[in-house]
Each structure stands twice: as C-alpha cells, then as structure tokens.
Curated annotation (Swiss-Prot):
Alphabetical keyword list: Aminoacyl-tRNA synthetase, ATP-binding, Coiled coil, Cytoplasm, Ligase, Nucleotide-binding, Protein biosynthesis
Organism this protein belongs to: Streptococcus agalactiae serotype III (strain NEM316)
Domain of life according to the entry: Bacteria
InterPro entries the UniProt entry points to: aa-tRNA-synth_I_CS, aa-tRNA-synth_Ia, Anticodon_Ia_Val, M/V/L/I-tRNA-synth_anticd-bd, Rossmann-like_a/b/a_fold, tRNA-bd_arm, tRNAsynth_Ia_anticodon-bd, Val-tRNA_synth_C_sf
HAMAP family, A to Z: Val_tRNA_synth_type1
Protein name: Valine--tRNA ligase
Domains: entry comment: ValRS has two distinct active sites: one for aminoacylation and one for editing. The misactivated threonine is translocated from the active site to the editing site.
The keyword Cytoplasm is annotated on this UniProt entry: yes
Subunit structure: Monomer.
PROSITE patterns according to UniProt: AA_TRNA_LIGASE_I
Compartments where found: Cytoplasm
UniProt: ATP binding residues: 523
Enzyme Commission no: 6.1.1.9
Length: 884
C-alpha cells in the first residue's frame, strides 16, 4: 500500500514514475494462462516521422481501454506495439533536414542516406515510446515490432514472391500518379482531390494542307509536346472526311494524324480531342488501341525535358504560362475559359500530382477483392463498428483498381527482383546466385508491408510460431475511418490470402479530432494541439476521460479546454470522495468490507440506503460492461459519471454522514464497508479509462496492482427493487422540497413546514422510517407524513409518484414582495430577448457571422425565452396565491 492521499489532486504527482513501476512489474505482458481465452490487439503502427498528435492519443486510448478491461476480466491479453517506416513520409522529412545543410540524398548515396534515415527512426521512435508512456499505454514492449525488422521483411518478400508466382503481381508500363516533389509513384488512394481555379485553353491545330483548323481544348497545354494524334468520333459527320489526314502541332510544327475513336464525344466541346498517351490515362488507352507512340515530355521532378523544345528545363507550371503566351503570339490561341475543377494532390507532399507514363509494379486486385467480398458472407467475417462502415469497405472492394506498389524511394522494402545484362529478370526471396545481377532500385509501397501487420508481427510465415498460434487472428482493430481504404481493406485481403483467416474479428472505427469550431486540425490552420501539452496541464487521466467520454463509434470529436476542465473536475471529485472514505475507514480491510456487504444484501445488517446504492452499483456494472462490449465508451462514461457524481457522491455519501457522525459503532462499520466496497468497484470500472489515479487510490487500501485486479461482475443478489423504489421516492421528495424552496426564494437554512400526503401505506411507512434523511436534507421545522393531510390555502404544491407535498407559505413569503421581484426578473429577460432578437433579425449579421456564432445567439434566445416563460408562470402562480 502507498502513502496517504494528498489533500489536493495533483496529476503530475500521481502519474510521475507510475508507468515505469508497471513496466518493472511486467503487468502488461500476457498472463500465459493457457486456460484463459486469448484477446489480442496490434497497435496501428504510427509513422516514425515525428511526434504523435491528438488523433493518435485518441486511437491508442481506445485500444488501452479495451485491453485493460479484458485483462481485468481474465483474458490472456496481448497488446502488441510497433511502428511503421512510412517510406515516402519519412524519406521526405530526412531529405528536408539534409537540404537545410545543403545536402541532397544523391550527394550521400543510397547506403549513407539510409544510415541517416535510421538515425531519424531511432530518434523519433524513442520520442513516440516516451509519449506512449505518458499516455499510460499497457503495451507489451517485449514484442515491439518495426515494419523493417528482418522478420517482417521476410514476410514481405514471401508475399511478394508468392503473388508474383501466381501472376497477381506484374510489372508494366502504365499511366500512374506521379509525385514530382517526392519523385515517386502514388496509388490512387494516396491522391487527394481538391477543387482549384483553372482554365480550359482552346487552341487551333491547322490541317497539314492549311485548308482549315481544328479547335482542341486542354487544361494542361504544357503537355502538347507529347501529343501524337487528335481524335474525332467515327460517327461525327463534321470530321469524317478528315480522318487519316494530319494536323500540325503548333510551336514545334510536327505533323500528327487525325484518328477515329469513340473516346471523342461529339457533344462535348468541339468534338476534337488531343491525344497525349504518356500524360493522360484515357489518352494512354486510346494510344494502346491505335498503336500510337508514347512521348514523355517531363522529367521526374516536374520540369520539362528536351522534347519540349525551347521550354526545356522549365517548371511545368511556368512552362504552362510560357506555352500559352507563345500560342497567343503565333495566333493559335482561341480563348481561355476560366473554371473550377478537381485536381489530384499528393497526400504526403501536397503538390499537384502528374499523370505520367512509367514502368511500375502492380498487384492484380480482381481475385483478392472477390475473396474479401465473399468472406463478408461467412461466419469468419469482419464485424465493423458502426456497421455502416462495412458498406464503405464493400463498395471500395467492388470498385478497386490494380494497386501500384512500387515507389521510387530508397527508404523501404527493396523490391525482390533482380536484372542482368541479358535483360533477364529473377524474382525470389533471396538474391540469385552468380554475378551480374542488379536488384530493382525501387521499394514497395509502405502499405504493402503494413497490410501484413496483424500476422507478420506474430511470427508468420512460421505458422508454428507460438504467438501466431495463440493470438492470431487478433480480436479487435481500432482505427480511423480515413484509412479504411489504405490499410483496413488491404489487411483483410492479404490475411485471407496468406493465412486463410480474417486478420481481426472486430474493427472499431472512430472519427477525427476537430477543434471547437468543428475544423479538422492541421498545420495550415495552426489549430493542432500537442497531447503532451494537455497532459502537462491536466494529466493523462483527464485527457483519456475526455477522449473516451466524448466518443461514439464512427463519430468525430471536438476538442475544447472547457471539456478538459470538466474532465479534471470529475477526477478531482473522485479524489475528494476517496479521501473522505479512506479518512473515515478506521483500518477496515477490503475483505472485511466484502463480508459486511454480503450481509447487507442479505438484509442481515445495514439500512435501505446501503441496499439502494449496492443495487444501483450492480445496475451500473451491467450497463457499463454492456456498453464496453459494444465499444460505446461515451455511453459507458455517461453512466459512470451519473452514478459516481449524482448517486454516490451527491446522495449516498451525504446520506452516510447521518451514520458516520453518530455513536452507533456497529452501523458505522457497515456504512464504512459499503463505502469502501462501492469505491473499490468504481475504481475498477474506471481503471481502463483512468489508469493512473485509480492505481494511486487503489494502493491506499489494497495490495498489488489494480491493473491485474478483477473487473466487476453483475451479482444477482445485489438486486433490490424495493430498496431502489423506496430511496428513489425519498430522493424525489427531497428534490421536490428543494426545488420549491428555490422557486419561492426561501433559503435552505430557513426552517419550514413540510406536509407529505400519501394514500400508499407502504410509502407512508417508508417515509416515516427514513424521516431522518428527509430532515437532514430539507431542514424542516415541522415534518408531517399522513394520508389525512388537507392542503393549506397558501402553499407550494408538488407531486411525486404516490404522494403530494405541500409547503405552507403564510409565514415564509410576502407575496407582494415576491411579485415585485418576479416583475423585475421578467423585465430583465424581456430586455435580453429584445437584444438577441434584434441581432438575429439583422440579415447582415446572420449572413456574415460564422455559423457557430449565429447558433450561439439562437441558443441564447431559446434559453432566455424559457426563463421568460417560467417567470410568467411563477407570476401567475403568485397572483393565484394572493387571490386565494
């Protein structure tokens, strides 16, 4: 047991050193109990590109909540940590650092550059692990993995070779998405489409005989040097007689043919389309059909090459301006038509993606997708939470394209293909024997290795590996909806292909962390928040409580410091309740408390309030467990908050003072037992969410770590509807009296007469038997409970289930004075309503103010109207009393 709780809750003191203690005690490792059911999670590996953000904190908090609860429930739990090499992202970061020193990766060469990247990886991996510790993540570091570990690399090579041998990986020249900044290919889902201002540039291509011109339009005139034809629809009567003739490509005066192809739409524009097979996917397909040459006019960095004539070496966008100016000077520019269109941008570097002809490696997706789709109709299907994301997954799998997996980078899994001087290619898990072989310089898409994460981390391809046999398939994956396509889908089809099983049973999808205004957090907006800064101010438990309590599967969460204040206040409340209970504990042990509680539920000792709180505790255990099973942590948090603050702290703890401040030692022991037992159960329920503070308090009265303590279970013997119904009626009575006092502005300290009329004999007896509680909470001068009470002429009346409550007002209230006070209050609310109404009737304000500002004013209006109406009602009531 640890030292006594400090008078004030200080998260820094509570959390300092605790994580290292857990690590020293090995409490995060699997139990090794072969009789226990296994439950495993693999952490979505963060990129070693920098520090973790608030989204990572949310993602890992949810996983930790799940694994801590399952550990307490007796499962043999494994939460496997690890990190992703993040090829393009990490390489870009290291290259940026080198540029600041005036060095490029080419200056260093591949081997020395990779040494620099490994240094970066070690630096940021240490930072990430430190942040995991601050968050309190109960991962098993003895099983930590990295996507470039040799074991995982072996798995990657095997998967590549097996798919290649099946004909499902192939190499070919196709139009791909090219990132000129990173100088690498991108898959379709690594391209973010944004609406940008652009233009259609209309230009004339003159027939070779000079008889007429054909007007074509393009958004990328700089690619015209790669034009190898113009196409018209074979059924378009305007151009039928021109098919087979040539037009002259402006600026370079090169003749290119007019071809017939249905790609040209007679209804769109002039019906004439320029064909640039090396720079447009549709044109590439046309070129394939007509056996056209493929002319690439750009370098891999987005500059124009020597085929662009005088524009050689210019950046593509500068070349665009220069080409348009040249066309205008030559008389070939017809018009510029401004418009907004969707343009692809690199997810990693943010630059405009260039469609580019390139030789790349691809995964053929047809059969892999069919397997994944078919699996969702079996007992082995992956369950999505919420279920609507199954539709998202299925839609993507049904419409998936072949996956370009090669990247023109140095950091990553180098493609296991080798070439010799004779033009031969060898694909294998190991290098070919003999000299003269050169390995493909490209690396694999990061997501290729990440797709194997759930089983490669468990020892696969060794299917006899202990962890693979014990913990695969994994139980639950927690991740954001933004990477269902990138990662979740790929893990599913790769796992089905190579293990014959789904990679995980459940996928919990969460949303994004947004700021108070609902905006996505980003560097450009400057609204990003470092979770470590939040932890420094509020503690990890408060952040974890906010992240869990504010979340519903699939929904976004808005971060606010107001919510963080509320989270801290809740933990502070728990701390203060705990201090009160432990200070009055008088050496009572948890085992003694359990024995006494058993007697309470059997009605051998204790009072009705003891049985009421134990009944409600039991209901809370059931509801929280059910919510956890559905991954509805926000619902669980609401249930816990209400029970702890409202029922336990505000009611039961206050009710116990009646006993604890008495001279009855036997009753005191029972009350202390119920208090300690209930606190213990609360801490166990809270531990998965608030590990640090619950461990600190648990250590005051129990041995060992709460990490390995058993999780509460529903106990049928605790159910007591009679006690529940009785105390709820008692609470209703007390609340009613308090509300009536407040309505007529009578101070709680002023003694009053309370008359309770009920025809329910059981309720009458219950109220009389527990009148001490009524008196403690309502401060009556006189309390009368009877079925024979007659309502006084001047009284506040309220009705609860089974009873009427009268508060005689004759000696308490000057009706005239109260009416005058209420009239002033009414005028105040009318003034507020006039002010907000004037603002909302201002069309300029409504049109120009931020939506959230307008909504705030509308909320004020609703609040003021409610208060205005309530005041009117009170005035009418006072007038009625006055007339009576």
């Amino acid at each position: 047991m640890s030292k006594e709780l400090s008078p004030k809750y200080n998260p820094a003191e509570v959390e300092e050193g605790r994580y290292q203690t857990w690590l020293d005690q090995d409490v995060f490792k699997p139990s090794g109990d072969t009789e226990a059911k296994p439950y495993s999670i693999v952490i979505p590996p963060p990129n070693v590109t920098g520090k973790l953000h608030l989204g990572h904190a949310w993602d890992t908090t949810l996983q930790d909540i799940i694994i801590r609860q399952k550990r307490m429930q007796g499962f043999d739990t494994l939460w496997l940590p690890g990190m992703d090499h993040a090829g393009i992202a990490t390489q870009a970061k290291v290259e940026e650092r080198l540029r600041e020193q005036g060095i490029s990766r080419y200056d260093l060469g591949r081997e020395k550059f990779l040494d620099k990247v490994w240094e970066w990886k070690d630096e940021y991996a240490a930072t990430i692990k430190s942040q995991w510790g601050k968050m309190g993540l109960s991962v098993d570091y003895s099983r930590e993995r990295f996507t470039l570990d040799e074991g995982l690399s072996k798995a990657v090579r095997k998967v590549f070779v097996d798919l290649y041998n099946k004909g499902w990986i192939y190499r070919g020249e196709f139009i791909i998405n090219w990132d000129p900044a990173a100088r690498t290919a991108l898959s379709d889902i690594e391209v973010i489409h944004k609406d940008v201002e652009g233009a259609f540039y209309h230009m004339n291509y003159m027939l070779e005989d000079g008889s007429r011109a054909l007007e074509v339009a393009t958004t990328r005139p700089e690619t015209m040097f790669g034009d190898v034809a113009v196409a018209v629809n074979p059924e378009d009567p305007r151009y039928k007689d021109l098919i087979g003739q040539n037009v002259i490509l402006p600026i370079i005066n090169k003749p290119i043919p007019i071809i017939a192809d249905e790609h040209a739409d007679p209804e769109f524009g002039t019906g004439v389309v320029k064909i640039t097979p090396a720079h447009d996917p549709n044109d590439f397909a046309v070129g394939q059909r007509h056996n056209l040459p493929q002319v690439n006019v750009m370098n891999d960095d987005g500059t124009m090459n020597e085929l662009a004539d005088e524009f050689n070496g210019m950046d593509r966008f500068e070349a665009r301006k220069a080409v348009v100016a040249k066309l205008e000077s030559l008389g070939n520019l017809v018009k510029i038509e401004k418009m907004t269109h969707s343009v692809g941008h690199s997810e990693r570097t943010g630059v405009v993606v260039e469609p580019r002809l390139s030789t790349q490696w691809f995964v053929k997706m047809d059969q892999l997708a069919k397997n994944a789709i078919a699996n969702q109709d079996t007992e082995d299907k992956v369950e999505f939470y919420p279920p609507r994301f199954n539709d998202t997954f299925m839609s993507w799998m049904e419409n998936v394209h072949d996956w370009v997996i090669s990247r023109q980078l140095w950091w990553g899994h180098q493609i296991p293909a080798w070439y010799n001087v004779n033009g031969e290619m060898y694909v294998g898990e190991d290098a070919p024997e003999g000299d003269g072989w050169t390995q493909d310089e490209d690396v694999l898409d990061t997501w290729f290795s990440s797709a194997l994460w759930p089983f490669s981390t468990m020892g696969w391809p060794d299917t006899e590996a202990a962890d693979f046999k014990r913990y695969f398939p994994t139980s639950t994956l927690v991740t954001g909806y933004d990477i269902i396509f990138f990662w979740v889908s790929r893990m599913i089809f790769q796992s089905l292909e190579f293990t014959g099983r789904q990679p995980f049973s459940n996928v919990l999808i969460h949303g994004l962390i947004r700021d108070e205004e609902g905006r996505k957090m980003s560097k450009s907006l400057g609204n990003g928040i470092d979770p470590m800064d939040v932890i420094e101010k509020y503690g990890a438990d408060a952040l974890r409580w906010f992240l869990s309590n504010g979340s519903a599967p699939g929904q976004d969460v808005r971060f606010s410091y107001e919510k963080m204040d509320a989270s801290w206040n809740f933990i502070n409340k728990i701390w203060n309740i705990s201090r009160y209970i432990l200070m009055n504990n008088e050496g009572l042990t948890l085992d003694q408390a359990r024995e006494n509680v058993e007697k309470v539920v059997n009605s051998q000792v204790g009072n009705v309030t003891d049985r009421w709180i134990l009944h409600n505790l039991n209901e809370t255990v059931g509801k929280v467990t059910e919510s956890f099973d559905k991954f509805e942590f926000g619902v669980a948090g609401h249930i816990l908050y209400n029970f702890i603050w409202e029922e336990f702290a505000n009611w039961y703890v206050e009710l116990t003072k009646e006993v604890l401040y008495s001279d009855n030692e036997d009753e005191k022991v029972v009350t202390r037992s119920v208090l300690l037992y209930t606190l213990d159960q609360i801490l166990r329920l809270l531990h998965p969410i608030m590990p640090f503070v619950t461990e600190e308090i648990f250590g005051q009265y129990a041995e060992g770590s709460i990490v390995l303590a058993s999780y509460p279970q529903v106990n049928a013997t605790f159910e007591n509807q009679t006690a529940h119904k009785g105390v709820e009626s008692l609470k209703d009575l007390i609340r009613s009296v308090r509300n009536s006092r407040a309505e007529v502005n009578v101070a709680p300290s002023k003694p009053i007469t309370i008359l309770v009329k009920t025809s329910d004999s059981e309720l009458e007896s219950f109220f009389k038997d527990n009148s001490n509680y009524i008196k403690r909470f309502t401060n009556p001068e006189t309390l009368e409970i009877s079925s024979a009470i007659t309502a006084p002429e001047l009284a506040m009346t309220s009705i609860i289930t089974g009873a009427e409550i009268f508060l005689p007002l004759a000696d308490l209230l000057n009706v005239e004075e109260e009416l005058a006070r209420l009239e002033k209050e009414l005028a105040k609310w009318q003034k507020e309503l006039n002010m907000v109404g004037k603002k909302l009737s201002n069309e300029r304000f409504v049109a120009n103010a931020k939506p959230e500002v307008v909504q705030k004013e509308k909320d004020k209006q609703t609040d003021y109207q409610t208060k205005y109406d309530a005041t009117i009602a009170r005035i009418e009531e006072m007038k009625k009393l006055n007339n009576d």
